[in-house]
């Protein structure tokens, strides 16, 4: 992937617009995980070290497009910057109305309000994209988590700015995924959990071609158990994808659980019963791995040199069905392998077990992370590549 890098651009005293991913979880006005904010900091700090006209914008949640809704405002993000990061970035101000121009106050970082409040954002509207472009001399795409979205602030804006480049976080994300997928040190192990095979079918098919072991968990594993003829009771599984699961089992080394933890009810207080997979009753549902299955996975992980992790292997939100995900998480954390993890539930598990600093790279992407693994071209990256081709390498001496 060949894009103009932020580090290659003359940023001195330029108007810089950074499209970051500040889509953080917020409860009662309080940010519950600031991981994405901190991941964006290096790019913001680099911009501030070169210019006193730096703007950052992002989406947050899913408001009705074109309508202001205070519950989706970036104000809590601004508050977080002011309270926790002022020593690193200085003053911060939220700007609500910015499409027709901005009144600058020197040495302030401007946070431009939620882009999804702007009509046309989600349809990649060119008129809106041109308004974004008019605000800046340099556009920095740093929102890997939104790189799969064809929207005005992530895609079309790059067609109309003088210089469009990749931010530090975007470069790190791509480099980490390339390291895991393009030339992995072997053995390579992928862990794919979640509720449905259908939602991760292309991921499973892509990974089956490159990994040495493909570990499946959650509802995905249930479909593979059913493909082997096991009764999965009232567990979540997809009967229509049993033939697909059988095909994957032939093409890839997929260790299927031999024992599981089940319950007759789905609740936080449900009793956990460990059983061989041949003993599951019709009124029971699989909610976690059993001890022998966990040991088998740990043995595989202990020998791995590259680990890609997306999704829990059980209902880890319930304490009685947390063991599988916790043991797998700790094994990855304690491994000497290069490890990369991504996806919303995966990040929740990483935070719950406090292992973020022990994973080689924790991706900020969810959908973008999965689509990259699938081998899809991410639109925001594609347009940055096209922008560089259009510039033909001549971007350092542009008259801003």
Curated annotation (Swiss-Prot):
Gene3D superfamilies: Phosphoglycerate kinase, N-terminal domain. It is found in: Cytoplasm. This is Phosphoglycerate kinase. It catalyses: (2R)-3-phosphoglycerate + ATP = (2R)-3-phospho-glyceroyl phosphate + ADP. HAMAP family: Phosphoglyc_kinase. It holds the Pfam family PGK. Substrate binds at residues 21-23, 36, 59-62, 116, 149. InterPro entries: Phosphoglycerate_kinase, Phosphoglycerate_kinase_N, Phosphoglycerate_kinase_sf. Pathway: Carbohydrate degradation; glycolysis; pyruvate from D-glyceraldehyde 3-phosphate: step 2/5. ATP binds at residues 200, 317, 343-346. Its EC number is 2.7.2.3. It comes from Blochmanniella floridana. Belongs to the phosphoglycerate kinase family. GO terms for molecular function: ADP binding; ATP binding; phosphoglycerate kinase activity. Monomer. Keywords: ATP-binding, Cytoplasm, Glycolysis, Kinase, Nucleotide-binding, Transferase. GO terms for biological process: gluconeogenesis; glycolytic process. It is an enzyme of class 2 (transferase). GO terms for cellular component: cytosol.
